[in-house]
């Protein structure tokens, strides 16, 4: 039974990870793309430069598909909550339901209404009014993110609640405290700025492939899009790194075990604390060896000063046992997965640095006065390949957030093992995992195929096709 129970928990966790990671491919992408398309259309409304109108229409197609796929994957994610985590839903429903209800009734309503108007009214409003529609859509996507992150931030740092001893459930006592949760206002800027960066990298990467095609009449469009995407990539990669630093300060305060794991620290560091570039982690014996360190750098990163030591996981584990043993027992394992967090952090920050470097070099090569980017095919290929890397960085950041909360599903209140549905079985979880994986593969394939087809047809395909359309009731429609 113990093995069966562990298998059920592992399979349920895998399904949650799979559905959330895949959903998170599209959420930052659609948020960022909507924002950048709004900027494009605003530039057109102000400058009347038609290339920005063409850009808004072309990249708007990519935004619409990512938005649609994000909705589908979000529905699947909510469905598996009820199927696999009913005890969690029962425990957290009073708190979790409020932000989700507001997200659906307010934010998603705004998105749905204005995205529909924006899609079908290109020639019915003045440019400024039409740009307002996509701005409202973009604001709606960001409002959705706030409410979802409010629920997740409660799971990381619970506020504004009490435990009903009769039912054993959380009850919401202060909605304002949930909204004002310091975790929320540290994680939200980091996520949103990373979303803008993601869209910028994708625009730059797809534009690079467009330039490599050398299709007549498209050079100006794709070069303008390329520089737009590169500027967005550079600016928002820098801003996202700064927001991530602020989030780190909150993690040190609320979840020291998570921070220690991201830095691979088992024993308390000396003062000042060195930053470990790479190391060999022995999670079984709770030790690390083969370290390559930069003296004093971790103190600067953690405390913004050249002094201060950092607690190790072994010390923090003892403190958590002293705090929670009376409630959860002495057999609890408070160590988070150190290898996952250590390398996820380095992948995330490494990719962010790579994007800054590539965007900076790309901007140099694509300067207006020196038309050299087309002659450096290697640079265009690098940019084209890099369009995938922000999705890896976003997933790595999600791994840090979720794996770093282990063994809690609601920090300090409810464990992952207690949250699984009592009716879940290995068979049903295996079946649903396979079905979801196949469905996600199909959705991902459709998204990639559509983006490729859109790029292949180019920005002026729709206009050329529209000229051939006729009134379905005109005589031309009947071949006369």
Predicted regions and their residues:
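Polytopic transmembrane helical bundles with strong interfacial aromatic enrichment
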Residues: 2-480
């Amino acid at each position: 039974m113990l093995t069966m129970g562990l298998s059920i928990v592992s399979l349920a966790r895998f399904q949650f990870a799979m559905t959330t990671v895949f959903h998170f491919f599209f959420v930052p992408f659609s948020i960022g793309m909507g924002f950048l398309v709004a900027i494009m259309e605003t530039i057109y409304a102000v400058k009347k430069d038609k290339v920005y109108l063409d850009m808004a229409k072309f990249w708007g197609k990519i935004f619409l598909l990512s938005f649609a796929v994000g909705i589908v994957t979000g529905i699947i994610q909510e469905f598996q909550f009820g199927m696999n985590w009913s005890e969690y839903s029962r425990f957290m429903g009073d708190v979790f339901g409020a932000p989700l209800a507001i997200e659906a009734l307010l934010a998603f309503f705004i998105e749905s209404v204005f995205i529909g108007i924006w899609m079908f009214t290109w020639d019915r409003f003045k440019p400024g009014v039409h740009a307002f529609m996509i701005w409202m859509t973009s604001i709606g996507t960001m409002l959705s993110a706030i409410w979802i992150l409010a629920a997740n931030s409660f799971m990381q740092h619970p506020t504004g609640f009490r435990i009903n001893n009769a039912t054993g459930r959380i009850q919401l006592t202060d909605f304002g405290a949930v909204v004002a949760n310091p975790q929320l206002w540290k994680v939200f800027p980091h996520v949103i700025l990373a979303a803008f960066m993601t869209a910028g990298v994708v625009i730059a990467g797809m534009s690079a492939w467009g330039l490599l095609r050398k299709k007549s009449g498209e050079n100006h469009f794709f070069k303008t899009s390329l520089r737009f995407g590169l500027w967005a990539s550079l600016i928002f990669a820098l801003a996202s790194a700064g927001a991530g630093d602020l989030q780190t300060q909150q993690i040190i305060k609320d979840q020291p075990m998570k921070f220690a794991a991201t830095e691979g620290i088992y024993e308390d560091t000396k003062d000042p604390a060195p930053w470990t570039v790479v190391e060999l982690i022995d999670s079984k014996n709770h030790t690390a060896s083969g370290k390559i360190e930069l003296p004093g750098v971790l103190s600067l990163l953690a405390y913004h000063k050249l002094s201060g030591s950092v607690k190790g996981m072994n010390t923090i584990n003892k403190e958590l046992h002293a705090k929670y043993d009376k409630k959860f027992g002495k057999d609890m394992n408070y160590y988070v997965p150190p290898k996952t967090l250590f390398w996820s952090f380095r992948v995330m920050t490494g990719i962010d640095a790579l994007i800054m470097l590539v965007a900076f070099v790309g901007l140099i090569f694509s300067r207006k006065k020196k038309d050299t980017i087309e002659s450096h095919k290697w640079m265009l290929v690098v940019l084209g390949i890099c369009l995938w890397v922000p999705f890896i960085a976003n997933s790595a950041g999600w791994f840090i957030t979720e794996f770093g909360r282990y063994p809690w599903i609601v920090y300090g209140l409810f464990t992952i093992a207690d949250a699984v549905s009592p009716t879940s079985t290995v068979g049903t979880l295996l079946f649903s995992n396979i079905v979801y994986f196949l469905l996600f593969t199909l959705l991902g394939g459709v998204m990639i195929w559509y983006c490729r087809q859109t790029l292949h047809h180019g920005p002026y395909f729709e206009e050329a096709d529209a000229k051939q359309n006729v009134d379905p009731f005109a005589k031309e429609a009947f071949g006369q």
